[in-house]
Amino acid sequence: MAKPKKKMKKAAPKARKAAPKAVKPKKPAAKAVKRAVAVKAAKPAKKISGRKVADVVTATTRASVDLESSIGRMERAAVRKVGEIAARATRAVRDAISPPIKLPSYDELPVRAGAPAGAAWGVFGDDDEVGTINLLTPERVIAATSSIRTGKVFALNLPINIPDPPLFTRGKHTHTVKIFPNAEFVLDDFLDNFYPQASSQWDALAHVKHPIHGAYNGIPDNQMTGRGGMRLGIDNLARRGIAGRGVLADVARYHERVGKSIDFTTAKSIPLEDVQAALEDEGVELRAGDILLVRIGWTKFYLSASDEIKAELAKETVVPGIEGSERTARWLWNNHLAAVASDSPALEALPKPPGEEMEFLHFHMLAFFGMPIGEMWNLEGLADDCAADGDYDFFLTSAPLNIPGGVGSPPNALAIK
């Protein structure tokens, strides 16, 4: 009888490996991505025809060329724009230095038949009422902005109550401040007996006429005052505005350097050569359309003077100033200045020194040239800054009061460095 087979014992199971760490269930989105990748891999890759490759290369090349072309157009446009700006700036500086229309020299005046010798009547038109301010063209105004270097601003007006007492027999104004009617929280004020030329000022072209030849451009008296009209008034300058390159001739500092002095209680005439030497010493050149400011030191003297001296000057105004001669007038015109202002009360010496009685510079400038005159400007702060940095040119603006037919106005002038 066959022996029954023994049951084989099952081998002991091997030791199980350590259970793996629990893995966070993957997000459904990740599984979906995995399935999509698997399906993509399972599908046989489509063959790309050579034609499609060529089309892609062509399209890419065209896009690259278009991009380069666009960049090139932009670069060329930028270069053109910069060139246009540079050309405009070059023209502005060129026009500022040399007027686009050649002006006659002093010895070539007059240009209008019947006008007196040395008169610029008709140069700016037979009906002109602003004279040499016409030289402040847009091109020159743009060029003048290059004189702004630091952004410093200097106000050139004295307070309207200085000089005190007023000079040249002018009256003293009164200033009244009052509460506005029916509004106790509002103040109002007004001036009585206000003389627009009692302090820092512009002389309008109507201010002085030649005793024989009359006013600028031959405009008759009956068109300047009364019912006949108000021509040559300060309103002409006010409506236009004054802006351009200013240049300071600091004659007072030049005198200090060379050991000269001025007695401000006398009518001493300062030679033209001193003005020219001051400009040369500063290293600044005049250009057509410049507004020349001449500092002789009078304002500094007056502000520190005693009450007795101020009272004496009010009683009899005796002041120094630049030489009031025809050669000075010739120099001013030949430099084609737009205007001239000074810190002195009359620009020139008054009363007229011996030998200069009939050479009143106001006749030449206002009546013959149409060149506005500024007087009693406060140039002290500006002069100190120019001496400190060595830059004697600046951008100058002035907004006279719009007084119809007025013969003068505070300048409301600013020098911007």
Q: What would you call each of these model-derived segments?
A:
Residues M1, G50-V53:
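Extended amphipathic alpha-helical heptad-repeat regions
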Residues T58-K417:
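Active-/binding-site microenvironments in catalytic and ligand-binding cores
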Residues K5-G50:
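Low-complexity, polybasic segments enriched for Lys interleaved with small residues
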